[in-house]
């Protein structure tokens, strides 16, 4: 079964990496955004995003 795609949004790259590494180990596909504007752009481009953190 394919896991959900998750968008991680945080202005601190270390925090994004920490969350991404954890979720990737659990089998999720993870996208990253630096801020809200970038997150909205990614969200509208990729209709498979199931969760935004």
Regions inferred by a protein language model and the residue ranges of each:
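Charged docking surfaces used in two-component/phosphorelay signaling
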Residues: 17-25
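Acidic, metal-coordinating helix/loop segments flanking the phosphotransfer/catalytic sites
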Residues: 7, 32-51
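Phosphate-coordination loops involved in phosphoryl transfer and adenosine-cofactor binding
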Residues: 2-3
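A generic structural motif
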Residues: 26-30
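Short acidic/polar segment at the start of the alpha1 helix of CheY-like receiver
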Residues: 12-16
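Short, flexible segments with low predicted structural confidence
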Residues: 10-11, 24
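Intrinsically disordered, low-complexity peptide-like regions
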Residues: 8-9, 19
């Amino acid at each position: 079964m394919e896991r959900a795609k998750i968008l991680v949004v945080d202005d601190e790259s270390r925090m994004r990496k920490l969350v991404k590494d954890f979720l990737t180990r659990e089998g999720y596909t993870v996208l990253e955004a630096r801020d809200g504007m970038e997150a909205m752009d990614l969200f509208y481009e990729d209709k498979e995003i199931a969760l935004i953190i």
